[in-house]
Amino acid sequence: MELQIVAPIPGKDYPQNWNDFLDWFGTEEACLGYLEKLRWGNGFVCPRCGTLGEAYRASRTRLMCRACQHQSTVTSGTIFDKTRTPLRVWLAAAWYLTNQKQGVSALGLQRVLGLGSYQTAWTMLHRFRRAMVRPGREQLNGLVDVDESYLSISDRQKPISPVGRKHSTTKILMAIAVEILQPKGFGRIRLRRIPDDSADCVVPFVQDVIEPQARVRTDGSAAYRSLSELGYVHERTVMLGSDVPAHVSMAGVHRVAALVQRWVLGTHHGSIQPGHLDAYLDEFVFRFNRRSSSSRGMLALTERVSRPKTRAILGLMRLNFLSVSGLDDVEVELRFVEQLEELQQRQAAAF
């Protein structure tokens, strides 16, 4: 009896090991088919005019819209757009990035996948990091600990120190927010690089990442005094003169700060350019918040990287109505709103 291989279901199935990955994504055709089902599982959406429905198969990789005859590929408008790197290499990078508990550096990815240059590996990882932050993601709620901590990194853009021939160490201040679960444990986290610990920096961070009415626990810093006026239940823990050490009373933020520092030193050998630190912090948040997931976030990541840039699509839709419809401004706006609602419903069903 012949063994039948069941095709993976996009957005649901996950290759548990490298052999599974090779069975599923061993060819470019398999990768294209997977991404097409993931992006257009409920029907083709033209990236130019936004028309919904079936499309012509113009070639192996191109689909043509029946309405405007625009040809596009499944990678149009995504992080794969116009890439010369094969899709199977991209998906292999995504699998390796998410399958490793501590992640992977650009040098490690270059070595494992046999990439031609370090820059290619770095660019791939940086594009994945951009996709790890979902616009409009949910804010933290419940009891949330907030504090700041310094992160030590090696700035390779600075001259090498004559003492020990080492790169100069730079300390970057970051804000940390950690959900505290009852009776114990931590929930989701948020991280952000901030220039200083003044109210102008920490209060906007709290407003961006924490729901109003949530309980926010901080140290005795005066920078957080306005939180009660902004609708938060503010609990101040004064460290000065307290018998309880800070790493006990604010265990969540201290634990996360230590994990971030260990991750930077272990995976990236402490070598991160300060200008790109926010992207690395986004990756750590993505990993930490999916630490209990069996797929370590690959399913979420592949969904996001295959999703088109909706803002660009909407702009093209509006231009298309103005240029070819012959409608006046009011009619264009009505048609645009109708098409936008239909597009949003289709994308919501697909993701």
Question: Where does each model-flagged region fall?
Answer:
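Residue-level recognition of single "structural anchor" positions
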Residues: 1-351
